[in-house]
């Protein structure tokens, strides 16, 4: 019985939060509800940049669309979903109530999933294309790891700025979403005005 009461209280809290979010102006509500899409679009851009850099290094000239679509689509979807699960949903349900925690979660999501993951994803995609079209001399079985580390170093150096930009943007977006949620929670309910 106690679990049922706790669950009912939790549902009331979620309903109250969503009702107050709906009172925000449309632009602010849009940022609060769809912020993960913006982070996902930045991750897709990071994926396309990493794909382009690896294609140049490995001299891959064929299958531009076949490599570009997954390098934009997969980082977008994973970053959008991860940001929604770790930042947006806990904020909207009241489980994430600390600004520092929100900034840390959103920044780490931007760094790991939105920045580093697309670069690591570009390695097998373009390595497979280089092997298929024989555009670059690939290593033998003994020195595969050292080859990919050596090949990836210039890409990671060039991707440093987009990765840092993605991290800072995600952290800033998390901070703004937290401030908007606090603003929404401080709004008075229509019809429940205090005199």
Swiss-Prot record:
One Pfam family, short name: TMEM126
Record's protein name: Transmembrane protein 126A
Record-level GO cellular component terms: mitochondrial inner membrane; mitochondrion; plasma membrane
Outcome (variant: residue 36 to L): In OPA7; likely pathogenic
InterPro entries (UniProt xref): TMEM126
Source domain of life: Eukaryota
Mitochondrial matrix topological domain: 1-33, 78-110, 176-195
């Amino acid at each position: 019985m106690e679990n049922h009461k706790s669950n009912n209280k939790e549902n009331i809290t979620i309903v109250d939060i969503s009702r107050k979010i709906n009172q925000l102006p449309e632009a602010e509500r849009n940022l609060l509800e769809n912020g993960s899409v913006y982070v996902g679009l930045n991750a897709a851009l990071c994926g396309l940049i990493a794909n382009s850099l690896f294609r140049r290094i490995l001299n891959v000239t064929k299958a531009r669309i076949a490599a570009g679509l997954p390098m934009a689509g997969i980082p977008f979807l994973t970053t959008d979903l991860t940001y929604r699960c770790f930042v947006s949903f806990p904020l909207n349900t009241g489980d994430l109530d600390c600004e520092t925690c929100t900034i840390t979660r959103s920044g780490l999501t931007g760094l790991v999933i939105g920045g580093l993951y697309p670069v690591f994803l570009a390695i097998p995609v373009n390595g497979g294309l280089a092997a298929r079209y024989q555009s670059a001399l690939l290593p033998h079985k003994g020195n595969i790891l050292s080859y990919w580390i050596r090949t990836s170093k210039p890409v990671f150096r060039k991707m440093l700025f987009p990765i840092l930009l993605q991290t800072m943007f995600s952290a800033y977006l998390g901070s703004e979403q937290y401030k908007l949620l606090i603003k929404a929670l401080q709004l008075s309910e229509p019809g429940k005005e205090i005199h």
